[in-house]
């Protein structure tokens, strides 16, 4: 959620306020999408997962949670407040959750329409159009063998047809939108559309043919899989030996890292490849639709994500606060009309730069509240350097760790509450040799810490008074 809110606002989490999952971006927050909408010439739309508001239930320690438009629990569907525009989005069709554990009225209504169109799609799940929404969602969510040993690895073999899976929901709605736009169904001359897939994310649940598309015995484990963390920070050592609760990981839903076998890891990786391949195919169909409907030549296309997955790196899976490269080094592909093609750029950049880049491409002014940098210079010349360093904020409420990370061309430094990481990315790209405790690197550590503290101070919220004195 923090990085998704950063992509919309162009602000750091400590500024826009969504510092961890389970915190809503407040309605009325300024976003770059608002700017495009208010220009009067853009229709703005999103299909899929947005996660600017939480989709958890009112339960346990969160009994007083506010209602969210993105709630994924059927018993609350009748109470959901509908905001329009939604953070600047004219048109929204949502799906919340991950894998087979997806829900939302928009998704369930689409499933019912697909089953009505082709009744055979409902047969594997015994879905009937007369079923209440809650029952349909339950059938989608638990269409699996609960005794399957793969479940302990967050790998799910289920009965949901490819045609009803969340990836298809996002793809089909995006293509339908492009068709409508090309036919003149909207009054605006331009569009912005988010095609946002819930996958890839655990539980890894590739549907149909995608489940067996990659065989575990044919995949390889990461080079860092055998890292025993003797040279890691105390925080990482503890997770390796006991599996502490972190974002996306807790005891009982996954093996302790030190106990993982190569066979286990290959099963998880193979399943993750399956969901990624389905997304690859879906993206290909969306790009084909752009061409088919005559929109390709004048459309900017950006492919990126909100975070990576550790995927077995250093024997860890899922998310942080383990700021290894597999988690933080994410894809960013961009195609612009008549732009340079098939080129790589080595300049540092981050998600916070996306909204300013889009606004500049659209010829819109960049507001003062944004804190990133436009990437237009590297789109004109891949040799350009836009940034010399990147700041990453990650607050982990499970362990009360507020990590701050600075990335430079050569170094990664991460500060925890009472320890840290220091890696030379040029000489140790696999991040196996933590230099934080090596006194011979104190000088560079202090230099990087000063840069980190200076940058953190510079981007922090302005001090505001309620009254003059």
Language model feature labels by segment:
Residues 1-412, 420, 429-433, 437-450, ...:
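Formylglycine-dependent sulfatase
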